């Protein structure tokens, strides 16, 4: 690495929990060499960088930006656009930036309903005057909520994606090594839009559990069963998103008896992860025998699928911003409960 010009790096969090920044700091000894390869141009989570520090830079002067978090507020949107303008390479880092993640489950309701749930209807809410925050007045430093949570690629052009909630630390090191070498001219640029720090197959292909021909009558909550350490969790009645989720984490959750939650995003060719997961769950349902009447078979399948608690939060936990259908939100060109193709435009 001697003789290299230090590349400039920006890291920013939008609608995020901070876990992606922790993942960057959790890369072990590799962190010690980071400052030799990158000049930190902007990283407000870990140092006292201000908006003007970024705004005053020339456009395109930041070599690499890792942006984590969903686009929830007007300020998030403005920062995404600013960082896109200042950065040569913009990476959607982590599940929130990739697909909206848990914040995007808010897209199941209008903003007004969300505010009412938080400030008026909560079981522990004490708000006798019924004060509900409104749209900040013009010139207010408080950012307004957007009408929906967006992923980063729905508001600006994204060069690459690093999935995960948060990205696994070993994979973060791989991505930093790759992009550092790319910026130094030592390796070719990946294909535009490439998913970095992940595998080409699904979590199931990384999972050591045995996929047997087991059928279930209903799906269980984790507290209802102690799974054995050999058999596929789906076959034991536990919801697992492995069949539809991109690999790269090493199947960390299934290895310890917890179903995959889908944080590495959809596998290759999966357009809607919730639809693919629904099909995977239906495939393990014990739908009776061929001697039963069609109505009886349908009723058994319906009962089994109804045992999946919180279907939206289970099947679209990390992907609601990219869901083909989003309940409760009328969209251009579609009936209530759908989002049209132009719905992400602001």
Explain the meaning of each model-derived region:
Residues 96-103, 121-122:
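Short gly/pro/ser/thr-enriched loop/turn and capping motifs at secondary-structure boundaries
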Residues 69-72, 96-98, 167:
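Short glycine-rich anion-binding loops that position phosphate/pyrophosphate groups of nucleotides
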Residues 1-66, 77, 81-89, 108, ...:
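Iron-sulfur (Fe-S) cluster-binding modules
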């Amino acid at each position: 690495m001697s003789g290299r010009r230090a590349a400039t790096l920006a890291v920013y969090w939008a609608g995020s929990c901070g876990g992606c920044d922790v993942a960057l700091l959790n890369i072990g000894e590799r962190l010690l060499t980071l400052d030799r390869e990158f000049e930190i141009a902007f990283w407000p989570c870990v140092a006292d960088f201000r908006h003007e520090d970024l705004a005053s830079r020339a456009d395109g002067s930041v070599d690499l930006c890792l942006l984590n978090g969903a686009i929830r507020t007007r300020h998030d949107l403005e920062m995404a656009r600013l960082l896109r303008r200042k950065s040569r390479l913009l990476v959607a880092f982590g599940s929130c930036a990739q697909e909206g993640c848990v914040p995007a489950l808010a897209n199941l309701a209008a903003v007004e309903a969300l505010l009412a749930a938080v400030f008026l209807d909560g079981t522990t809410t004490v708000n006798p005057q019924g004060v509900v925050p409104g749209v900040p007045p013009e010139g207010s430093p408080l950012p307004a909520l957007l009408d929906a949570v967006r992923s980063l690629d729905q508001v600006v052009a994204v060069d690459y994606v690093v999935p995960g909630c948060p990205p696994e630390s070993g994979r973060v090191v791989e991505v930093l090594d790759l992009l550092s070498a790319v910026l130094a001219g030592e390796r070719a640029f990946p294909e535009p839009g490439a998913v970095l720090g992940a595998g080409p197959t699904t979590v199931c292909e990384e999972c050591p559990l045995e996929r047997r021909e087991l059928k279930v009558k209903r799906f269980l909550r984790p507290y209802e069963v102690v799974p054995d350490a050999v058999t596929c969790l789906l076959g034991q009645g536990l919801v697992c998103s492995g069949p539809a989720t991109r690999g790269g984490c090493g199947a960390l959750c299934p290895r310890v008896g917890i179903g995959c939650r889908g944080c590495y995003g959809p596998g290759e060719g999966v357009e809607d992860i919730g639809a693919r997961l629904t099909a995977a769950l239906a495939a393990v349902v014990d739908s009776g025998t061929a001697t039963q009447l069609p109505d009886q078979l349908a009723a058994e399948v319906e009962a089994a699928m109804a045992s999946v608690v919180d279907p939206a939060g289970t099947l679209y936990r990390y992907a609601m911003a990219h869901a083909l259908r989003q309940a409760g939100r009328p969209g251009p060109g579609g009936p209530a409960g759908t989002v049209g193709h132009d719905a992400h435009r602001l």
